[in-house]
A protein has these predicted regions:
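Hydrophobic helical h-region of N-terminal Sec-dependent signal peptides
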Residues: 10-14
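Compact, glycine-rich, soluble single-domain proteins
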Residues: 22-199
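C-terminal motif of bacterial Sec signal peptides marking the signal peptidase cleavage site
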Residues: 17-20
Length: 199
């Protein structure tokens, strides 16, 4: 699934200009530069960034994302290995063009801001469940998403910072509901991905 880039494109571009990811080394938080379009973990692939015949501007690549960093997440008693989508290309491409997803795997979308969001399933073949998560790592909303649907599913909250996609039904099987706090093997989401104040 990819994010509906509409109102988020400008803000997502900020990802390319800031170090949005932190990892702990020797007991302290050390900044890690967020990947840019030129320095992603994936090799160069065909990308669109121009107006298509339909008049839509597309920022996603035309093949599945590969070699993304993985972070272990803890959701209550459940654990999940989540790929990290941070750069504009990664946020726009998401799970597009993939045909399978391991049972306890997912993708965590990391935005450098808090906002309302809207996701859809363009070019996404896997049935997914999507959690909208606030800046503290608390799940606010969970939705089941229909493969290949271009109908946006907007958040009710305007305080969303992260989005977690998993196989459809995974949250229900694990008894995970809104209100569940997500932590990681390296600390809280807010510690790993600090917000930047924009003026």
């Amino acid at each position: 699934m990819d994010s509906k880039v509409t109102s988020l494109v400008g803000a997502a571009l900020i990802v390319l200009l800031m170090g949005g990811c932190y990892e702990k080394k020797n007991g302290g938080a050390q900044p890690v530069k967020a990947p840019s379009l030129e320095s992603t973990a994936t090799p160069p692939v065909p990308m669109t960034g121009v107006v298509s015949e339909s008049g839509e501007i597309q920022y996603h690549q035309n093949t599945p994302l590969v070699n993304l960093p993985v972070l272990k997440l803890y959701l209550g008693k459940a654990t999940l290995n989540a790929e990290l989508a941070i750069s504009l290309k990664e946020l726009a491409t998401g799970m597009m063009f993939r045909k399978e997803l391991e049972e306890n795997a997912g993708m965590l979308f990391v935005y450098p801001f808090v906002s309302d969001v809207a996701f859809y399933m363009k070019n996404t073949y896997i049935p997914l469940s999507c959690a909208y998560i606030d800046a503290e790592g608390i799940i606010q909303e969970i939705y089941d998403m229909k493969p290949l649907s271009e109908e946006s599913i907007p958040s009710k909250s305007d305080k969303i910072r992260f989005i977690l996609e998993v196989n459809q039904g995974w949250f229900e099987k694990q008894n995970i509901d809104p209100g569940t706090l997500i932590t990681t093997e390296k600390g809280s989401l807010s510690e790993l991905f600090p917000l930047t104040t924009y003026r």
